[in-house]
């Protein structure tokens, strides 16, 4: 994934890619956690053309992230409402490239920056020689083509979900609400091997 990302970065003339959203952080690091359920503190991943990936994260997550393949982790002491990682992120960017460069961010279709607007504006101001540009199309292009391993995992979870749908009528009663039915389905998904159910419409 990193190799393909760098090729796309070269095409887009990007020297760095700043990842902030949980699903893309998970995609590049393999790290999955309920830390994402709290929007209080951001987590950053910085990919560059010529350096190993660097994670910039709150100190509470360092031990867990060290179990992944990411070896460069810059952590700040958190909670720190006055500076939740922005100075650490800024210093990390400058350590890679102190002069002008283009940094891709998740700013386009179905994307978002998982940081406050004030912090992003502060980052732009403090790194005036650097430009932050939309790289969502790069990430979309990268993620649309699945590897054999990804396809295998998709087949597995689709099979689990299909089995739950098939079995669901056996566990339902006439007087149950939609919420109760959804809760039954969530439990059955977990029982059959799903990791979790983040979203279910009812």
Predicted regions and their residues:
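N-terminal accessory/capping or targeting/presequence segment of soluble
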Residues: 1-87, 91, 159-164
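Active-site cofactor/co-catalyst pockets and adjacent glycine-rich loops in catalytic enzymes
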Residues: 22, 28-32, 39, 49, ...
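Flexible, acidic/His-enriched mid-domain "rim/lid" segments that flank
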Residues: 2, 81-197
């Amino acid at each position: 994934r990193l190799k393909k990302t760098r090729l796309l970065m070269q095409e887009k003339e990007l020297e760095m890619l700043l990842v902030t959203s949980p699903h893309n952080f998970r995609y590049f690091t393999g790290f999955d956690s309920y830390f994402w359920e709290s929007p209080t503190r951001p987590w950053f991943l910085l990919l560059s053309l010529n350096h190993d990936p660097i994670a910039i994260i709150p100190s509470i997550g360092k031990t867990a992230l060290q179990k992944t393949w990411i070896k460069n982790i810059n952590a700040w002491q958190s909670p720190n409402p006055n500076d939740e990682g922005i100075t650490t992120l800024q210093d990390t960017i400058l350590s890679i490239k102190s002069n002008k460069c283009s940094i891709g961010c998740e700013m386009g279709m179905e994307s978002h920056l998982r940081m406050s607007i004030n912090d992003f504006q502060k980052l732009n101001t403090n790194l005036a020689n650097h430009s932050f540009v939309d790289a969502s199309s790069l990430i979309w292009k990268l993620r649309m083509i699945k590897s054999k391993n990804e396809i295998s995992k998709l087949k597995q979870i689709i099979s689990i979900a299909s089995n739950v749908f098939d079995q669901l009528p056996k566990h339902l009663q006439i007087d149950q609400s939609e919420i109760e039915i959804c809760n039954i389905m969530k439990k059955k998904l977990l029982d059959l091997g799903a990791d979790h159910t983040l979203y279910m419409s009812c």
